[in-house]
Amino acid sequence: MTYEESVTYLNSVTDQLIKRIGGQLSESNMDMLTLDEHCMLAYRYLRDEVMEGGFIQLIQNGYGPYVLLGPFPMLLKKEWGMKQFGQFLFDVAREYKANREELESDKSEEDFMAQYEQFDALNEYGDEYLDDYEEEVTPLIAEYYKAHKAN
């Protein structure tokens, strides 16, 4: 699967998942998805948010707990065979947890933008994802899911 094909596949699968859960993930519909489906959705949120505004945007938009503190990093590392990427997400999660209250607080646009300097490590993690992981991991995620999904 080429990179472009994997992006199309990822978006198609996750669009269907989002439709199935009624448009937005919530506590009341979490059990409608399998663990592998949650991994696909978590990766979609991660990829979309980090490509647009880094991990700071991902966290500010409310995806931090689901993507970084949920089972997604551990599943990648232990079951999906993506040890290095899973560990990378654990490193991001450690930085997130250390600054969680400040990162999740409501902010003006100006204060939000200032976080990119204030939390330089998270900003660098976003660059690292884009430079070192995104083009390699996206096809691996799509291929793993396609090969292991329930038929």
Indicate residue ranges for each PLM-predicted region.
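Non-transmembrane, aqueous-exposed alpha-helical and coiled segments at domain scale
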Residues: 72-74
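Extended, alpha-helix-rich binding/interface surfaces that flank or overlap catalytic cores
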Residues: 1-56, 60-69, 79-151
